[in-house]
Amino acid sequence: MKSKRQALSPLQLMEQTYDVVNFHPGGAEIIENYQGRDATDAFMVMHFQEAFDKLKRMPKINPSFELPPQAAVNEAQEDFRKLREELIATGMFDASPLWYSYKISTTLGLGVLGYFLMVQYQMYFIGAVLLGMHYQQMGWLSHDICHHQTFKNRNWNNLVGLVFGNGLQGFSVTCWKDRHNAHHSATNVQGHDPDIDNLPPLAWSEDDVTRASPISRKLIQFQQYYFLVICILLRFIWCFQCVLTVRSLKDRDNQFYRSQYKKEAIGLALHWTLKALFHLFFMPSILTSLLVFFVSELVGGFGIAIVVFMNHYPLEKIGDPVWDGHGFSVGQIHETMNIRRGIITDWFFGGLNYQIEHHLWPTLPRHNLTAVSYQVEQLCQKHNLPYRNPLPHEGLVILLRYLAVFARMAEKQPAGKAL
């Protein structure tokens, strides 16, 4: 019987094999997704030149089992590779210090204004709403930073990510990286994308309905009705999951994760300690304290959740054969959906309304997504690929109708045991 670590090596990159699972900062889950597959394209789009240089210095290994041949590159895949090279050459992957200075200052300003209105003018409800908006916008900013879009030095990205993610948000950046990078590597692929594993209470595929317990199926029958309530509560769930994940870091096989344990724990402890002290010293009553706490958390959670769910969840979930047949770039286009560009939409969605472009190149700075989207749309037209781009309210309708499909399926499913 192979140990988990043995099962997770080697990884095939550019016709060579490497053992990276024991130190990979992006997590072991993404490595697991590419066992027995060529990971070249996924590696290329999720790393900068620094990682390529490090890879060249690593010893190559001889795998103990036969690896598949390097994945064939079709015309569409080749065109997207060429476009990436053009974008690099024209500086589109270079972050604007001015833009990110503006984004950091305005995002912090939302939180400062919220606290100021509560402390100075006792405007508790308005202040709590602003604080919730701060949490939402800080979520997108942390997302940019943890994808290494913001700073050229990855150590600065990691440090600021800890401050903004753990300290100001209460989210573990290591927990986020582990799940989010796996999601990027295998979007909407059942058994590989952790984002679509939401049982209970949400079913996103026929397989989910089949696997659900009889009690879960009863619940799923109404999922399109309670979905928005779940969005409101998700920040609480995520924060709780982050605490559990950070507690487990010190026992992980991945040495990078073990090295992050103390930093992550200090960041989360600081977030909740400062929040508790604010409520203790600046809230006039327990009721006001509860109002501020729940309004800010619910607004922040809903603002993040509704964006995240809209961009790829209402699209068909696929298995390994379809995933392998698409190739990386084409697969991302088939399994992601944009939301129509616009000033308000771009701000509220934090650039994730350009989900197609972001999934093609996760390290592309947010402020360049709009310009690049026109080029991607043209390539999609050239290769007869879908470029979904509904308005925000249309995207929500698509999402709710998709949930309703599996709600009806759960209603018709025999009341036997889950498979």
Swiss-Prot record:
| Top EC class, one word | oxidoreductase
For this chain the motif Histidine box-1 maps to 143-147
Q: Which residues cross the membrane?
A: 110-130, 156-176, 226-246, 266-286, 290-310
Q: What does the entry's domain section say?
A: The histidine box domains may contain the active site and/or be involved in metal ion binding.
Sequence motif Histidine box-2, location on chain: 180-184
Do you know which Gene3D superfamilies this protein is assigned to? Cytochrome b5-like heme/steroid binding domain
Source species of the chain: Euglena gracilis
Domain of life, per lineage? Eukaryota
Residue ranges of the motif Histidine box-3? 355-359
Q: List the EC numbers from the record.
A: 1.14.19.4
> Where primarily located?
membrane
Keyword Protein transport assigned:
no
Described function: Delta(8)-fatty-acid desaturase which introduces a double bond at the 8-position in 20-carbon chain length fatty acids (C20) that have an existing delta-11 unsaturation (double bond). Whether it acts on CoA-linked substrates (as in animals) or phospholipid-linked substrates (as in plants and fungi) is still not clear.
The record's listing under CDD domains reads: Delta6-FADS-like
Q: Does the keyword Heme apply?
A: yes
What is this protein's name? Answer: Delta(8)-fatty-acid desaturase
Mention one GO biological process in which this protein takes part, according to its record: fatty acid metabolic process
Concerning PANTHER family, the annotation shows: DELTA(5) FATTY ACID DESATURASE FAT-4, FATTY ACID DESATURASE 2
Q: How does it sit in the membrane?
A: Multi-pass membrane protein
